[in-house]
Amino acid sequence: MGLLSDPVRRRALARLVLRLNAPLCVLSYVAGIAWFLALVFPPLTQRTYMSENAMGSTMVEEQFAGGDRARAFARDFAAHRKKSGALPVAWLERTMRSVGLEVYTQSFSRKLPFPDETHERYMVSGTNVYGILRAPRAASTESLVLTVPCGSDSTNSQAVGLLLALAAHFRGQIYWAKDIVFLVTEHDLLGTEAWLEAYHDVNVTGMQSSPLQGRAGAIQAAVALELSSDVVTSLDVAVEGLNGQLPNLDLLNLFQTFCQKGGLLCTLQGKLQPEDWTSLDGPLQGLQTLLLMVLRQASGRPHGSHGLFLRYRVEALTLRGINSFRQYKYDLVAVGKALEGMFRKLNHLLERLHQSFFLYLLPGLSRFVSIGLYMPAVGFLLLVLGLKALELWMQLHEAGMGLEEPGGAPGPSVPLPPSQGVGLASLVAPLLISQAMGLALYVLPVLGQHVATQHFPVAEAEAVVLTLLAIYAAGLALPHNTHRVVSTQAPDRGWMALKLVALIYLALQLGCIALTNFSLGFLLATTMVPTAALAKPHGPRTLYAALLVLTSPAATLLGSLFLWRELQEAPLSLAEGWQLFLAALAQGVLEHHTYGALLFPLLSLGLYPCWLLFWNVLFWK
C-alpha cells in the first residue's frame, strides 16, 4: 500500500505503466491467440474418460435384430406421408399401439414474426405423436426420450422406422427402470419446442399447443436421431445447443464407447478422429474440428433437436447417419444396437448426469479441453482492455508536466492532458444515443416490416434484413449527432473519458459472454479488442476507421461464415457469402423470437452500442 500512497512512487509507477503499455498490450493479445492455438496439443488437451460409475462399463449384450422390421416401418411411413402430404398421425398412432405403447398426440401452432424463407413457412401448425413405454421395475418418476424430428424438407423416414423397431424391441424387455418416451415431432424444432413446453408446463416462446394427455417421469436424458438412408458409413454427433449450451461430457463418452464396441465409425463436426496426437498432423486436424465447434457454438443456434432439451436441464445429443462414399457401411441393426446400449446404460443412472464436465471444447471425440484450460485465452485478450483502461485512467488523473524519480531527481516529462474537468454531457450524450441506436436495431426491423412492404417492393423477410442493415449503417453518423450537444471545454479529456467508459463496458460484456458461451466471447474479443485499443481521434484516422468497420460485429459474422465454409472444404464466392450473410441475419432474428436465441439481442443491445462508442471516439472533434 505504500507504493500507492507515496505520490513519488505512484508517479513512477504511472510513468512505467505508460511507457510499457503498448508492448504489454501486444504481448497479451499474442499470448491469448497463442494459448487458444495451443489447446489442441496434448499438454493442454486431455483424453476423455467416463466419470459416472453407473456407465463405466459396456458389458451389456445388445440383442436388437430388427433391421428388416425397421425398413418395413420406414417404407410404410414414407408411403403414408407422401399420400397425406403431412405427418401420418393416424398411422403412427396405430403402429405405436400395435407395439404396446401408450400413445398420445399434441397439436400446436405458431405464427412466426415474419416468413421463414429458408423453410418456406409462416403460419405453422402441426401434430406431435409420442408413445410411452412404462417402466415395469419402478414407478414412473424418471424417463428417457428417443426423438425423431420430421421437417417439411426431409421426411427422416429411416429414423422413424428405427424408432418404431426399437420401441417394439424394448417392449419385450423387463429390465427397464425408467419410462422411455418415443417422440416423433413435426416441423423439426418447432414441434420439439412445443412438446417440451407442454411437458414442463411452461410457455417461453409464445407457442400455442394443446396440453399433454400423458406424461412420463422427469426426463434424465434424450437422444435425437436423423438418418438419411437405411445404410450409413458413419454416425456424426452434434452437441451444440441453444445459446451455446453443451450436454454433460459423459453422454458423449457413452456414445463414443458404444460406437467403438460395435465397430461404428463416429465423427465430430463431420471430421474423422485424429489417430496420432504426438505428431503435428493430429493437432492440426484437431484444430480444424475445434474451430468448427467454436463457430457452431458461437452462433447460439440449436444444431439439432437436442439443443432445445438442454434449456430444460436434460442432457441430450443428436446423432446423424452419414451415407458417404466410404467403403465400409453399416445397416440399421448396427445403429440400433448402439442406441440400445446407450439406453440400457442410461437406465442404470440413479441421478442426473453431473460427474463430468458441462463446459468444454472438443478437438476430437477422444480429446477434450476443460474450462480451466481454455479460459486463459480470453483472459489474455481482455487484459488488453484492462491495460488500455488503466493507461487512460492514469492520464486523466495524473497532472503535471514533470515527474520526479524516487531520489528526487527530475525525470523526463510525460505529456498529459491539462487538468480540466470533463463535462458530464460529453459522456451522457454519446452513451444515450448509442444505446438508442441499439434499441432501434433490436425493435424496429420486426415492428416496421409491414410498413416497409407497403412502401417498397420487398417481402417481409427482406424488409427485416434491409431495415437491419439500414439502422446499422445509420449508426456511422453518430459522431455528427453527438458533437452537437457535447461539451467542448476539454476535448482531449472528453474522448479519453468516453474511451475509458467504452473499454470497461466492452470488457464487462465480453467477460460475461465468455462465461456462458466461451466461443462467442473469444471470437468477438479476437476481432474487437485490437481496434478498441487503437481507436483515437489522432493518427491515421482513415486506417483506424477501416479497421473498426472490418472488426464490427456484422463483419465478424460475415468473416465467420467464410471461415466456416473454408473449414468444411466448401469455400464461398463473395456473392454466395453475401447471400448467406443476409440469410444468417434473418435466421438470427427469427430464432430469437421463435426459440429464445440470445445472439441477436446481445449484438444489438450490447455490443453494437459499445462499438458505436469507439466509432464516436475515432471521429471526436
Curated annotation (Swiss-Prot):
Cytoplasmic side: 2-19, 394-425, 484-495, 537-540, 620-621
A Gene Ontology BP annotation from the UniProt entry: attachment of GPI anchor to protein
Any one cellular-component term (Gene Ontology): membrane
Pfam families the UniProt entry points to: Gaa1
Effect noted on mutating H354F: Reduces GPI-anchor transamidase activity by ~25%
Annotated phenotype, changing S51L: In GPIBD15; results in low amounts of GPI-anchored proteins on cell surface
Binding site for a 2-acyl-6-[6-phosphoethanolamine-alpha-D-mannosyl-(1->2)-6-phosphoethanolamine-alpha-D-mannosyl-(1->6)-2-phosphoethanolamine-alpha-D-mannosyl-(1->4)-alpha-D-glucosaminyl]-1-(1-radyl,2-acyl-sn-glycero-3-phospho)-1D-myo-inositol: Y49, S51, H354, Q355, S356
Disulfide bonds, paired cysteine numbers: C259-C266
Presence of keyword Endoplasmic reticulum: yes
Stretches that traverse the bilayer: 20-41, 371-393, 426-450, 463-483, 496-519, 520-536, 541-563, 598-619
Coiled-coil blocks: none
Consequence of changing L291P: In GPIBD15; results in low amounts of GPI-anchored proteins on cell surface
Stretches of the chain found on the membrane's Lumenal side: 42-370, 451-462, 564-597
Keywords: Disease variant, Disulfide bond, Endoplasmic reticulum, Glycoprotein, GPI-anchor biosynthesis, Membrane, Transmembrane, Transmembrane helix
Name under which the protein is recorded: GPI-anchor transamidase component GPAA1
Species the sequence originates in: Homo sapiens
Gene: GPAA1
